[in-house]
Amino acid sequence: MKNEIAAVVFFFTRLVRKHDKLKKEAVERFAEKLTQILQEKYKNHWYPEKPSKGQAYRCIRVNKFQRVDPDVLKACEDSCILYSDLGLPKELTLWVDPCEVCCRYGKKNNAFIVASFENEDENKDEISKKVSRALDKVTSDYHSGSSSSDEDTSKEVEVKPSAVATTPSPVYQISELIFPPLPMWHPLPRKKPGMYRGGGHQSHYPPPVPFAYPSPGRKNKAFRPIPVTWVPPPGMHCDRNHWINPHMLAPH
């Protein structure tokens, strides 16, 4: 396990030095903290007899869904450096398995072997040479491809105004949906006071209310006159010889 972790640490160290944002002491401090974190994490999830077991748990991943790897971030915090100063690409995946460390650098690039080990007797110089050769190859062959993939990623995230439908959707008021507007009814024209004079004197009774006035939302029914009873004014007696004013009829 120590060789595989050493390969991962060498890989990150070379990337950080290429970015040239941190001093040598800060890079060494980061490498030491990352080594301790990975050893503590992998010690109970390392299966030489079945290397693929626990592969997802040991994976170090940076992409648009996980922009910061938690183990690398913890190493930065423990070594008092900023994560952004590492200069990591936007798409990076490292598979740390027994006897082999693989990497995919960039979004559309193929995975490659960073280092493979047949035994545990290899020294750090040999591991460093393997990692350096692999990293030099990937940065020279895939650097332009990873940059274009990062640009494609930013373009995918950006929302283009032309892709959005510009046709306005109909807007309805809540009152229109719940309470439909009632039809307009024209009021009866007002009559002058002189029109209700009968028998030489002004009537004290209002004009008759039109019966069977249509109501909104209902079908018109057949006209049925409402029975009325004539109520004589106080002090006036009714007999058959008197003329009855129709405006003096009042609903019963």
From Swiss-Prot:
Highly expressed in the brain. Residues 138-162 are annotated as: Disordered. GO terms for cellular component: cytoplasm; nucleus. One of its GO terms (biological process) is response to oxidative stress. Gene3D superfamilies: Anti-proliferative protein, N-terminal domain (3.90.640.90). Induction: By 12-O-tetradecanoylphorbol-13-acetate (TPA). Induced at higher levels by TPA and cycloheximide together. Also induced by redox changes after stimulation by hydrogen peroxide or menadione. PROSITE patterns: BTG_1, BTG_2. Pfam families: BTG. Belongs to the BTG family. This is Protein BTG3. It comes from Rattus norvegicus.
